[in-house]
Amino acid sequence: MKIVDNFIFFWGGWLSNFHPCRIVFGSKVFKSSEQLFMYLKALHFGDVETAEKILLAETPKEAKTLGREVRNFDEKSWNEVKIQKMYLALEGKFSQNKDLMDKLKDPALDGKFFVEASPFDRIWGIGYDQDHALQNQSNWGENLLGKTLTFYRGSL
């Protein structure tokens, strides 16, 4: 994590969806917000079989891979709900893990905007690493994870 001006650049670490944390959602237990997010994706499309496989995933990477195999996937439908599903995953992550919530509520982060500085993801991130982000700000990707984190923190 690197704070520059009003931006909190992150990729990996405790803000990442791959960060290990215990989340209980319904009667199910998840090992990361990525696993919960992919589970919610599978359920959205009625793919219970893949949802069950995601539940058994040992790593966030495995859950993400399974999430790409969801049957009946429809991009238009997913685009309408994916931010809501991400919000639920983040809410579970932070509300159920006091250590992470304490970090998120750090006053040093007040008034700042979260930016996922992933050079590989222009949807959930900006498509640039933190060292090249500012000089390319006009070309950033959507940063949906950063925006959702910023919104979630603002709701606390």
Residue ranges of predicted features:
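Charged, low-complexity intrinsically disordered segments
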Residues: 1-156
